[in-house]
Amino acid sequence: LFFKTLCAIGTHLPSSHQKTLPALERPVNIHSPHFPDLHIACCTDVNYFTHTVATIASVLENHPHRIVHIHLIAEGVDAKDLAKLRLAIGAHNGLLYLYTPPADAAQRFRVHSSPRLSTAAYYRCFLADLLPRELERVLYLDGDVIVRKPLDAFYDRPLGNWAVAAVKDYGNITAKDFERLHIPEAHGYFNSGVLLLALEQWRKDDVLAQCTAYFAAHPERIVY
C-alpha cells in the first residue's frame, strides 16, 4: 500500500512554468543513535520523476531497519510533488534532501546522441561536489531500478582507495561497443545505474573533471 501511495505522487507531472523547490539549505542530519544510516542518491527531471519515485519507494520498503537518507538532484519537478514526496518519505522513517543541478551542467554534458537521454543522466557526476563533505559514501541508483531486498551487504562493503564500486554489465555489450569506447574487452563494462561512491576519494581523484574532459573530447563515443 505504501509503495502504491508513494508512486502515485509522480503520476501528475507539472507544467514547465511551475516553480521547483530550492536547493537544500539546512545541515544534513547524517547520524542516528538508533538505526544505521543508508544514504541513497537519485537524479531526475520532470520526465523521469515518476520512475524515480518508484525507485525510492522500493528502497524504503526494504530498509525498515535503517534511517534512509534520499539525496535527490531534481530539475523541473513541481514543488508540490516534491513536498508530497518529502512527507511520504518522512512517514516511512526517511529523510529527503533536495539539490539543484549546477547551472553549467547542460554545457558540460550536452546530449546529442539519443532522445532517451537528458542532461539529468549526468547529474550523478556532480554528487561529490553537491553532497555534504562529512558524508563518506552514497549509493547512486538510476530511476529504473527496483530494489527487491536489503542493500546492506553492498552498501557497507569496504572500498579501500577506490572511488566507486560497480557491477559488471552482462547486457548486450558487443565487441563494437568496446571498439567505439576504446576499452579492451578484458577490462569489462560496468552498469552505471548502481554506483557506490566513496565521495572523498571521488574528489581526490577529481572524477568530475575527468568525466567532463572525456565527454568534451569524445562526444561521439557517448551513445548510452
Show the residue positions of the predicted features:
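Short, acidic, metal-binding catalytic loop of nucleotide-sugar glycosyltransferases
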Residues: S58-R66
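N-proximal low-complexity "stem/linker" segments adjacent to membrane-targeting elements
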Residues: L1-A57
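Short alpha-helix within the catalytic core of nucleotide-sugar-dependent glycosyltransferases
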Residues: L82-R86, R133, R148-G160, L208
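Short internal beta-strands
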Residues: V68-G76, A165-V167
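Conserved donor-nucleotide/metal-binding helix-loop-beta segment in metal-dependent transferases, i.e.
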Residues: V145-L181
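Active-site-proximal specificity loops/subdomain of glycosyltransferases
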Residues: A83-L130
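Catalytic core and acceptor-binding pocket of nucleotide-sugar-dependent glycosyltransferases
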Residues: C42, A165-N172, H187-Y224
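Short aromatic/hydrophobic "clamp" motif used to bind/position activated sugar donors
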Residues: V138
